[in-house]
């Protein structure tokens, strides 16, 4: 038994024997040594509320609430990460019963409800968060993704930037270990399939380069390798790989329009899932490519007409829409196929990969 445990037991015995002043003093010592000791905080709060110890009852009760919410939030977050959505939902609801303004619990409950496929409740809590923070780009985007309000033609630059800045440090681990992320490898395979085996000699743009996962595969084919991304935190990690000749913090279509006829190859792994209407991006890619240049990219596939903003906050496209849009932009499809891009919530995410040549 630790010294603090002995101190707590002694305080409890003193409280039972009616020695409230001495007991309260010891409970306070316990909390000084161990600020998150819930039992000591509860005992002291009860004594203060009953008038058996000095102090502000509201402040004493707040200490209890803070300890309970923090502890419960930790359990809820762990449950959410491991796909125990039922446990996470119970935890977040318990927190909000104690503190209705606990913002992280509101967001966590929205995420857990979405993971549990309760889209109505997910929308309710994302909307609650968005109403509290109307300038939060992610909340506003997801509310739209869940079907409330008009569907934007693309995710805002601010949303994309904030989303990827927030988990840049853990990006590679999450994608490769948790989600079995395959898009860069699939794009590399498609490149080799269309005759891109020759090492060196290509001016390549890694569009939405992120941390450089695609760049690792394509460096061997590049006389120059340029990466572009909206997230400065992702670009820092890409720079650390030492594989890029240039890294640009720019919006993709703007970047490509500003560099006419500069690239032999443009690759974009899981980039157009943040763009619904592909016309502007494909037109810009056509401008940036040299005559006969190739663009290879992936989209999340869906059977409905055109494109749709899904509840995940990402866009999915019908392959026929991709082919039609590329033809209008001045491309011919060399090859296209469906494959699994990654695993999410235990389910495969089906995608469409295409290699287009400028004509």
Language-model regions, residue ranges each:
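A short acidic, Gly/Pro-enriched loop at the edge of an enzyme's catalytic core
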Residues: 257-266
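Short, glycine-/aromatic-enriched active-site segment of Class I SAM-dependent methyltransferases
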Residues: 297-315
């Amino acid at each position: 038994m630790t010294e603090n445990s002995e101190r707590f037991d002694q305080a409890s015995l003193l409280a039972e024997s009616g020695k409230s002043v001495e007991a309260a003093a010891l409970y306070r010592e316990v909390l000084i040594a161990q600020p998150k000791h819930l039992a000591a905080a509860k005992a002291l709060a009860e004594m203060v509320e009953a008038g058996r110890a000095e102090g502000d009852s509201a402040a004493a009760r707040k200490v209890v609430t803070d300890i309970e919410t923090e502890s419960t939030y930790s359990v809820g977050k762990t449950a959410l990460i491991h796909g125990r959505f039922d446990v996470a939902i119970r935890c977040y609801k318990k927190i909000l019963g104690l503190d209705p303004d606990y913002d992280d619990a509101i967001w966590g409950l929205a995420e857990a409800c979405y993971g549990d496929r309760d889209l109505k409740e997910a929308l309710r809590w994302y909307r609650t968060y968005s109403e509290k923070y109307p300038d939060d780009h992610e909340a506003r985007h997801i509310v739209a993704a869940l079907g409330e309000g008009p569907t934007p033609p693309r995710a805002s630059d601010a949303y994309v930037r904030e989303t990827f800045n927030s988990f840049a440090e853990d990006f590679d681990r999450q994608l490769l270990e948790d989600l079995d992320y395959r898009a860069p490898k699939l794009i590399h395979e498609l490149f080799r399939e269309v005759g891109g085996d020759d090492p060196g000699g290509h001016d390549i743009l890694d569009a939405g380069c992120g941390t450089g996962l695609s760049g690792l595969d394509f460096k061997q084919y590049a006389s120059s390798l340029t990466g572009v991304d909206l997230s400065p935190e992702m670009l820092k990690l890409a720079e650390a790989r030492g594989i890029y000749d240039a890294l640009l913090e720019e919006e993709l279509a703007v970047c490509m329009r500003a560099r006419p006829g500069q690239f032999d190859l443009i690759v974009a792994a899981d980039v157009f899932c943040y763009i619904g209407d592909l016309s502007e991006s494909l037109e810009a890619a056509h401008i940036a490519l040299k005559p006969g240049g190739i663009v290879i990219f992936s989209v999340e596939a869906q059977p409905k007409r055109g494109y749709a903003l899904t509840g995940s906050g990402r866009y999915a496209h019908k392959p026929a829409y991709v082919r039609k849009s590329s033809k209008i932009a001045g491309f011919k499809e060399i090859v296209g196929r469906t494959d699994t891009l990654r695993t999410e919530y235990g389910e495969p995410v089906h995608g469409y990969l295409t290699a287009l040549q400028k004509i």
